[in-house]
A protein has these predicted regions:
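Asp-box/BNR beta-propeller blade signature and adjacent active/binding-site loops
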Residues: 1-156
Length: 156
């Protein structure tokens, strides 16, 4: 994070054998780690980015199928709120995806950008696509998408 906090996505199985995504973090350069609450039940294979100082977005494989779940925390996972795009904006066939945040100072548009890649379909692992969001993940417009491969694949 911009304040030096180390953060990475996690998943754990609860007592009913349902997977849950969340985050772990360290404020002491990795000497100790803490974890608070899950972001959403029945989710795995998450990606985490800091969208603005102190605000983390967790983008998760949702085992219910059809689309990605997305949640926001401003307190390192103590509380989570569902992002407006959750289960709406990013279709997928229930598989791993990638998400990165590119700061305005590091790109030619001079805007913060989220880059996301996954199979852009609800069936099969094909149509591997990179998408860009210029509004914090609210929209992923077709003109900001690049299909890399139409064929079947095992991963991204």
């Amino acid at each position: 994070m911009s304040d030096g906090t180390l953060v990475f996505p996690t998943q754990f199985i609860d007592s009913t054998r349902v997977p849950n995504a969340g985050i772990m973090y360290s404020k002491d350069r990795g000497k100790t780690w803490k974890m608070h609450n899950m972001a959403r039940t029945n989710t795995t294979e998450a990606q985490v980015v800091e969208t603005e100082p102190g605000v983390l977005m967790l983008n998760m494989r949702d085992n219910r199928g059809g689309s990605r779940a997305v949640a926001i925390t401003k307190d390192l996972g103590k509380t989570w709120t569902e992002h407006p795009s959750s289960r709406k904006a990013l279709q997928e066939p229930v598989c791993m995806a990638s998400l990165i945040h590119v700061e305005a100072k590091d790109n030619v548009l001079d805007k913060d950008i989220l880059l996301f890649s996954n199979p852009n379909t609800t069936r099969g692992r094909n149509h591997i696509t990179i998408k860009a969001s210029l509004d914090g993940g609210l929209t992923w417009l077709p003109e900001h998408q690049l299909m890399l491969d139409e064929g079947e694949g095992l991963g991204i």
